[in-house]
Amino acid sequence: MGTVKCIGILTSGGDAPGMNAAIRAVTRAAIYNGLQVKGIYRGYKGLVTGEIKEFKSQNVSNIIQLGGTILKTARCKEFTTPEGRQLAYDNMKREGIDALVIIGGDGSLTGARIFAQEFDVPCIGLPGTIDNDLYGTDTTIGYDTALNTILDAVDKIRDTATSHERLFFVEVMGRDAGFLALNGAIASGAEAAIIPEFSTEVDQLEEFIKNGFRKSKNSSIVLVAESELTGGAMHYAERVKNEYPQYDVRVTILGHLQRGGSPTAHDRILASRLGAAAIDAIMEDQRNVMIGIEHDEIVYVPFSKAIKNDKPVKRDLVNVLKELSI
């Protein structure tokens, strides 16, 4: 196990349902293996400012069902500077922390990679993001819960869209990845998904919608990823309104609703497995890897691979949506 006797845990970047389940798993697995645990508040900001507290098993009782993160999360400009990272390292050493477990997305893992390279600190990452955009893992903590939140919202929007015979553009999160939009569309029976991985022109949408109305579909729902590459739901809605004023068009932006809520059973189990595996990795002297899951097996993915590679959307899912929305 080397010289690791105390680990620090932090959550960074956008919050995701299941982060608390991961905090619980890391804490209890560490204690089970004889390690001391320190909770670092507000992500890398807490490492810079010294907001650090010892965690016992009872500190993580009754949190597995909670959304958000008890450790809080924040952006930290100071950590992007060498001076800020030096402060973070000094605080880490003062607290006796030998290794870090970072729960977050690609920005969080990028920060961990830089920190590890500069100070030779063992860092283990857990994929915590609703976007599901990290390479090397089939799914990320929070993605399943966000997908179910989208499904619940679209089911309700479908009721009013049908009643008023309207075309709804529903914008979902995902940044530059279309996993939420595409799989949300398949799960909800939406007519189309606009995602950054594949271009969609207004005339393609219009022909698709026309076909639906010819087949007695009196309403349609299109899910749009929030990416700058797509322009978002408002962009498409305005273009359709201008070019095809015969359609009654509405826009719903789900926004931060997707980040909240109690995590699903899938996310709780995933977070628990990944959290326990993070401690296994530390005990094995692993460093600077993300813990992922592929084909239901735990994998160690180097930070460089997880961060630099784009996670592809499966073309067969695009085809499934196209075939089922006729």
Curated annotation (Swiss-Prot):
Chief localisation class: cytoplasm
Activity modulation: Allosterically activated by ADP and other diphosphonucleosides, and allosterically inhibited by phosphoenolpyruvate.
GO biological process, one term: canonical glycolysis
Pfam families assigned to the protein according to its UniProt record, in alphabetical order: PFK
Location(s) in or outside the cell: Cytoplasm
Domain of life: Bacteria
Binding positions (substrate): T129, I130, D131, R166, M173, G174, R175, E226, R250, H256, L257, Q258, R259
Entry GO MF terms: 6-phosphofructokinase activity; ATP binding; fructose-6-phosphate binding; metal ion binding
Enzymatic reactions: beta-D-fructose 6-phosphate + ATP = beta-D-fructose 1,6-bisphosphate + ADP + H(+)
Binding sites annotated in the UniProt record for ADP: R24, A25, V26, T27, R28, R158, G189, A190, E191, K215, K217, N218, S219
This protein's record includes keyword Metal-binding: yes
Cofactors that this protein relies on: Mg(2+)
Pathway(s) annotated for this protein in UniProt: Carbohydrate degradation; glycolysis; D-glyceraldehyde 3-phosphate and glycerone phosphate from D-glucose: step 3/4
ATP-binding as UniProt keyword: yes
EC number: 2.7.1.11
Residues that coordinate or bind ATP: G14, R75, C76, G105, D106, G107, S108
Gene Ontology CC entries for this record: 6-phosphofructokinase complex
Keywords assigned by UniProt, alphabetized: Allosteric enzyme, ATP-binding, Cytoplasm, Glycolysis, Kinase, Magnesium, Metal-binding, Nucleotide-binding, Transferase
Active site as annotated: D131
Binding site for Mg(2+): D106
Subunit note: Homotetramer.
Purpose of the protein: Catalyzes the phosphorylation of D-fructose 6-phosphate to fructose 1,6-bisphosphate by ATP, the first committing step of glycolysis.
Family per record: Belongs to the phosphofructokinase type A (PFKA) family. ATP-dependent PFK group I subfamily. Prokaryotic clade 'B1' sub-subfamily.
Protein's recorded name: ATP-dependent 6-phosphofructokinase 2
